[in-house]
Amino acid sequence: MHVAVIGSGYVGLVAGACLAETGNDVICVDKDAEKIRRLQQNEIPIYEPGLEPMVRRNQEEGRLTFTTDLPAAVRAARVVFIAVGTPPGEDGSADLQHVLAVAREIGRNMNDSKVVVTKSTVPVGTAEKVRAAVRCETQQPFAVCSNPEFLKEGAAIEDFMKPDRVVIGVDDEEARAVMGELYAPFTRQGGNRVLFMDIASAEVTKYAANAMLATRISFMNQMARFCELVGADVNNVRLGIGSDQRIGRAFLYPGPGYGGSCFPKDVKAIIHTADALGLSLDVLKAVEDVNEAQKRVVLHKTIKYLGKDLSGKSVGIWGLAFKAETDDMRESPTIPLINGLLETGARVQTHDPKATDSARAIFGDRVMYCADPYSAAHGADALLVMTEWLVYRNPDFERVRKLLRRPLLIDGRNLYDPDRMTALGFEYHGIGRSRR
């Protein structure tokens, strides 16, 4: 099938590469000429495991091309995905100007029947706005679908190729058949993995899914703080409640708060949409409040044990990205942590396997970027673990302890066993793991 993907950012690039992998002829479009030039040279602007070889392979085999020529891509396609950004406004609402501008451009270049698919994360009602924008520019027949993505950064290729489910909002039988054919190769492992539904429900599903996951994270982070007060270990509590099949163990890990490009933005957007309709989503507002407070927990622990004035003190940080297996620093809990440390006068030395360039764009030369974890620990008065990269899970702890000026280890991801760390000579403090 001939497919155009408008927007070659994270979602568009992954979708385009995976659709090409199953034999479709895919054209990925972006207005950024330099990005397109780099993609044509197989230079991937983001870190995502498995993406670079997939892009390279499909370009070499002629199924995947990159261009700035949106009109030509639209004319060549049967299905056109809109995968441009929807950045949040100051009030938390999703900015649809790029989505609707692309929709109008699609309409102006429509030469036969097309299926126009919103892949971007958009609020309920957007598909109707897209339909109106396209209709203003063409008399050609077309259908509009909603096909939200459910990709986890760091596992996006696996998520797309072997999805838990594919949600498709559609109100046209021909479009339903086209989308079913397009996704058939990804759902042959059995089960009813393609969920066709009305468009509004598909649009809500994306926001509801991310809001639920964010809620679980904030719930466990609040339980972690409670555990510290009563002398319990949140890890034991996590195992105890996660063993209940009604609850399950996914997304029950306490930490420094959620971040990234999805959860913060999507929770704000659904709250804003509901507020505009006269409904206050009080649970999700509490989820946001808990998360903002949680982002300060590691900083507060550092100040508690090192003092309010950190002038002359060095703090090592392992992990900058908001999660492992990505270079994404958007809304990372490490950002307010580092800003807080700098405000108190600390010298900050950091390490991350992939996110150093992203961090440098934020902090410039105000922090030190180390080539390996041990350099970040060298001479530090405290070591803070902020991202659950594999490289941090089992280092040479004796070497780390000797490198530290003071063996203060604040484990923001609960990677380590408290008793073992204490036996190794560390002053260990986790999240929700009382040492009383």
List each language-model region with its residue ranges:
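Structural/interface elements that position substrates and couple domains in central-metabolism enzymes
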Residues: 1-436
